[in-house]
Regions:
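Sec-dependent N-terminal signal peptides
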Residues: 12-18
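Acidic, polar-rich low-complexity tracts and alpha-helical solenoid repeat scaffolds
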Residues: 2-11, 22-201
Length: 201
């Protein structure tokens, strides 16, 4: 009984310590946001990013964009904003920011990586086979555009493999559609679908 009581007290102390640390962390982040020292904010944002605290990093990147527009830090902020969304699996928004980065900083060191990541966003949004494959087609198009732009890219092999995976998905979906008509005994539709399938493949 005494042992159980001690164990319970230790758990309560641990929970209290965790809560205090969380409150302290929130308070510190609020102070950083209110700070007028942009360099401090920038370094804090990069620290948060390194710690995989993408939400807090994004909040700081957002308030710093106007302060560093046209400066080297502005380029970094634009790129890491996209990276935050990518790592948070918000792929639609990440793709938007990668493309915007490439447009605003066409000669930046991370443009190639950004455009590859943008294509990867479409790949990661590609749905399961039974659903509409618009994102799958878009991913193929994006990877192909990337390859045309950077034929010697270090990402070229990865792009080729991902295109092959996406194309195989479309082939499988088309074949399943043909088989569905056959199983439903809609034979004319099945024949037409199979003919179209064979021509395409």
């Amino acid at each position: 009984m005494y042992f159980c009581s001690m164990l319970k007290n230790r758990y309560l102390i641990l929970i209290c310590v965790i809560c205090l640390m969380a409150f302290a962390s929130c308070g510190n982040h609020t102070q950083i946001l209110k700070s007028t020292d942009n360099e401090y904010k920038y370094n804090s944002a990069m620290h948060y990013y390194g710690q995989k605290d993408y939400n807090r990093a994004l909040q700081l990147f957002d308030v710093l964009q106007s302060a560093y527009r046209g400066k080297p830090q502005g380029e970094e902020i634009a790129y890491y904003t996209a990276e935050c969304y990518y790592n948070m699996k918000d792929y639609d928004i990440a793709s938007h920011y990668y493309k915007r980065y490439a447009v605003n900083y066409p000669f930046a060191k991370n443009v190639e990586a950004a455009l590859f990541r943008s294509a990867c966003c479409y790949y990661l949004e590609s749905p399961s086979i039974e659903l509409d494959q618009e994102d799958t087609y878009m991913a193929i198009k994006e990877f192909q555009s990337f390859k045309d732009l950077y034929p010697q890219s270090v990402y070229a092999d990865s792009a080729n493999r991902l295109i092959e995976t996406l194309e195989n998905k479309i082939v499988e979906k088309d074949f399943n559609t043909c088989m569905l008509y056959y199983k439903m005994e809609e034979f004319q539709a099945a024949i037409t679908s199979f003919e179209r399938f064979l021509k395409a493949n």
